[in-house]
Regions:
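Short, charged, surface-exposed secondary-structure boundary motifs
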Residues: 38-42, 115-116, 141-143
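Structural beta-sheet core signal
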Residues: 5, 76, 104-107, 132
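Glycine-rich phosphate/pyrophosphate-binding loop and the adjoining helix
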Residues: 129-160
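Short Gly/Pro-enriched loop/turn and capping motifs at secondary-structure junctions
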Residues: 80-83, 109-113, 138-141
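Short, aromatic/basic amphipathic alpha-helical patches
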Residues: 116-125
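A generic structural motif
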Residues: 31-34, 106-107, 132-138
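N-terminal beta1-alpha1-beta2 submodule of the flavodoxin-like/Rossmannoid cofactor-binding fold
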Residues: 1-76, 83-85, 90, 94, ...
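Short, conserved loop/helix-junction motifs that constitute active-site signature segments
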Residues: 68, 94-101, 124-128
Length: 160
């Protein structure tokens, strides 16, 4: 099964998890980058990131190489912003039909909102469901055995 992990990461938590998942599954990776970067700290990070997520904005992305037909499974990874999928992931799923792929997702959060974000992702991507989901609490900045166990279980479920 050919797999790719497509993700957006602002502070490194999602990138950390994406690399671990890709290594465990032997998957390709694609890190999405918006043409205009989001602020990475302070009040502006929460204001602009939250506004962009709540308003369902679709930011332009830096060019990337991806063809859905090259993959059996697409894993989407993102930080949760105001209970929403991050805008770069929204842009990606609106620009690329994933209906023929098995789609899974993982979300990194500091508080709550991942379940709500997964439902919005399903709607935005126009798919029936996510094959597997994974919620991590700040996996890079607050490493824990629980996060590691969750990553292992997620990968095992995707292999099976």
């Amino acid at each position: 099964m050919k797999t790719i992990v497509v993700y957006y990461s602002l502070e490194g938590n999602t990138a950390y998890a994406a690399e671990k998942i890709a290594a465990a599954l032997g998957a390709d990776t694609l890190r999405l980058q918006p043409k205009k970067a989001y602020p990475s700290s302070g009040f502006q990070k929460f204001f602009w990131g939250g506004k962009s997520a709540v308003m369902a904005e679709k930011p332009a992305l830096e060019p990337y190489a991806f063809r859905a037909e090259d993959y059996d499974c697409v894993i989407l990874g993102f930080p949760v912003w105001a209970g929403n999928v991050t805008p770069p992931i929204r842009t990606f799923v609106l620009d690329n039909s994933l209906r023929a792929c098995r789609v899974a997702a993982f979300a990194c959060e500091s508080g709550a909102g991942a379940e709500k974000a997964f439902h919005k992702l399903v709607d935005c991507a126009g798919i029936d469901r996510l094959r597997e989901t994974l919620i991590l609490i700040d996996p890079k900045t607050k490493p824990s055995e629980e996060n590691e166990r969750r990553i292992e279980a997620f990968c095992a479920a995707l292999r099976g």
